Design a protein with these regions (language model features):
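Conserved ATP/PPi-binding loop(s) of AMP-dependent carboxylate-activating enzymes
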Residues: 415-418, 428-476, 514
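N-lobe entry segment of adenylate-forming
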Residues: 1-70, 74-89, 94, 163, ...
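Conserved AMP-binding/adenylation subdomain of ANL enzymes
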Residues: 257-274, 282-327, 336-337, 341-350
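Conserved pre-ATP/AMP-binding loop-to-beta segment of ANL
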Residues: 189-238, 245, 268-274
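AMP-binding/adenylate-forming catalytic core of the ANL superfamily
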Residues: 129, 136, 146-148, 456, ...
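AMP-binding/adenylate-forming catalytic domain of the ANL superfamily
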Residues: 172, 575-598, 616-619
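Conserved AMP-binding A3 loop
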Residues: 69-73, 226, 234-258
Length: 619
């Protein structure tokens, strides 16, 4: 069995000695206070005892103006009942997969904890998946149980489930764990109707149960399961799927636990702090930084079934007591939306009405880049945003900018305790690193750009059923197992890495490398531009051409205040010719995923279809 000391990082690396390593943060993960690699359920128990939080509210669930508070002891009781039902009634055993197709809710937390109680593998599924996407996810993991909202069941998974290994569907409703009664409950019911009476007791090829009834009728049992945290998966999560269909990342108990303890001293996480759960739990960012942070480190998770409007978010925060402070775990889209709301009513008026700005200790950005045109106004109104870098395959966090003391904006930060990173040739990993972070390598700076590779105990077990993908993305070097991230960047003399772009997003214009992120950042400085997305399109003359999709700030109109030719000229005046967009299309809004990432592929595919049909590209 591995030990944390097996992941020792050479303390000669420049990030330890360049003047930016945060004071008081151990250089090695094995030196972090109270670090212990246990099965998830054991970790939950240890945390509850260590901080004596059994009778503390650790889950705060918001439905409109209603707030439901749940004590940790209650969560354990509910989870043990759910796990007992899975084990006794359904025969679910260690290694079996339970798919959870739910929004952030008490329901999700109970289902997830119940899986960890019996050693089942929890698979998070996006509730907005269409039938074919659901079929693909369930087929890849061979899930045996599907937990889903009653409204989604009514929408019709019947065409999909008979083609899978699912033998049981557990239907639930957002009000299943709400304790309100009388008029308050009825008001909630008016907004969140129940479809349980329309859910059948069984279908032709699977049984159907109701989660609320399961909890009411099941007596919890003590179930002991032998789990090796280093080799047994705790969760299956779908990766972003930048090309083709998404893959399934297998994350072990040790992957998830080690990542939490990497972040803890760096971000100064303390039990009792509130972490805002707007990021979905089927995504590794929300799973680790919100739910697992609460259950394994003693934080309080503030849950919304969908990202709230900014007035609701601000009003909710104002109602809550937060003596330990609040962490806003979010993505650029949510930060921008909050800034836009403050500016719409005026900063002075906002701060009279709400106290969010006083309670927010810091904000953490992940799941994509953070542009200065969002960061600067947010930090002026609220607090510093610290950017984290990671992937689903790394549970997810690899690095974060230092929270206190000197730092560098626009960088990916420094690797967390226990994480090592290096820059390798993007087309020849076996040649060894271009820059490994030792002073001797001395290959620092933009001229030594390559693929960012990381190693540490947080790196996934592998891709489920994808042997070639696994071999292409997980490779051994110098006795360590490295993940090839697919991201292109370079390291500076202090160990900070600057991300240039995704390897697959790189645009080649007449032999020049164009990084979409750089063009987006430059165009974002235009006074009329609100958001911009950049991608490459095939071009007969130059190989590829740059296209930008642009939304304008409120009060500006395309073709009246500015047109594409005027904006192209501005770009040519402010960046190299080969970087300047050949096409600029104004759009009303950007397509975004539930995690707030702009879906460049969705924009690009419309034009690829036009090219294939011989039609003219807009812009």
């Amino acid at each position: 069995m591995p030990e944390l000391k097996d992941f020792h990082v050479d303390e000669n690396k420049v990030w330890f000695n360049g003047g930016y390593w945060p004071e008081g943060v151990p250089k090695q993960l094995y030196n972090v206070e109270n670090v212990s690699i246990d099965p998830m359920w054991e970790g939950f128990l240890k945390t509850a005892d260590l901080y004596d939080i059994w009778d503390k509210d650790v889950c705060v669930f918001v439905l409109g103006e209603y707030i439901e508070r749940v004590k940790l002891r209650t969560l354990f009781d509910l989870a043990k009942k759910f796990g007992t039902f899975l084990y006794d009634k359904l025969g679910i055993r260690k290694g079996d997969v339970v798919a959870i197709e739910l929004p952030n809710s008490i329901n999700f937390v109970v289902a997830y904890m119940g899986c960890q109680y019996i050693g089942a593998i929890a698979q998070g599924i996006n509730p907005t998946y269409r039938p074919m996407e659901l079929l693909h996810s369930l087929t890849m993991t061979n899930a045996k149980v599907l937990v889903m909202m009653d409204a989604l069941y009514i929408a019709g998974p019947n065409s999909v489930l008979p083609k899978t290994k699912v033998h049981t569907v557990i239907s639930t409703n957002l009000l299943d764990f709400i304790t309100a009664t009388g008029d308050i409950f009825q008001a909630l019911r008016n907004n969140i109707p129940s479809f349980q009476d329309k859910v059948p007791d069984e279908a032709d090829q699977y049984k159907v149960y109701r989660m609320k009834k399961i909890i009411e009728e099941t007596e919890p049992k003590e179930i002991k399961v032998e789990i090796d945290p280093w080799i047994d998966p705790a969760v299956y999560l779908m990766t972003g799927g930048t090309t083709g269909l998404p893959k399934v990342a297998m994350l072990s108990h040790a992957n998830l636990i080690s990542n939490l303890y990497m972040m803890r001293p760096w971000t100064m996480l303390e039990h009792g702090m509130i972490t805002i759960g707007s990021i979905p739990f089927f995504h590794s960012y929300g799973l680790t930084c919100v739910m697992s942070a609460a259950l394994n480190l003693g934080l309080v998770m503030l849950l919304f079934p969908r990202p709230p409007t900014d007035d609701v978010l601000s009003e909710t925060i104002t109602k809550l007591e937060a003596p330990e402070g609040i962490i806003y775990v979010a993505v650029e889209m949510l930060f921008k939306r909050l800034v836009d709301y403050v500016e719409s009513i005026g900063e002075e008026e906002y701060k009279k009405k709400y106290d969010f700005h006083k309670k927010m200790k810091y904000a953490s950005q992940g799941a994509g880049p953070l542009h200065d045109y969002v960061r600067i106004p947010f930090e002026k109104i609220f607090c510093p945003i610290r950017v984290g870098y990671g992937l689903t395959e790394t549970s997810p966090t690899c690095s974060i900018n230092p929270f206190w003391g000197p730092t560098k904006t626009g960088k990916l930060g420094l690797p967390l305790p226990g994480v090592d990173w290096a820059i390798f040739p993007s087309d020849d990993f076996e040649a060894g690193p271009i820059c490994d972070g030792t002073p001797e390598s001395n290959n620092f700076g933009i001229e030594h750009t390559g693929e960012i590779c990381v190693t540490g105990p947080h790196v996934m077990l592998g891709y489920l059923g994808e042997q070639k993908e696994q071999e292409d993305n997980l490779k051994m070097w110098n006795g360590k197992r490295w993940l090839l991230t697919g991201d292109i960047g370079f390291m500076d003399e202090h160990g900070f890495i600057e991300l240039r772009d995704r390897k697959k997003s790189l645009i080649k214009v007449s032999g020049h490398s164009v990084f979409p992120k750089e063009v987006e950042e430059l165009m974002g400085h235009h006074e009329m531009i609100d958001e911009v997305a950049v991608a490459g399109l095939p071009d007969k003359m130059t190989g590829e051409a740059v296209k930008a999709w642009v939304t304008l700030k409120k009060g500006f109109k395309a073709d009246q205040d500015i047109d594409s030719e005027t904006l192209k000229k501005w770009c040519q005046d402010n960046m190299a010719k080969w970087k300047s967009p050949k096409y600029i299309e104004f759009v009303r809004k950007m397509p975004v995923s539930l995690t707030g990432k702009v879906q460049h592929r969705a924009l690009k595919e419309k034009d690829l279809d036009k090219i294939e049909k011989g039609k003219e590209i807009k812009g």
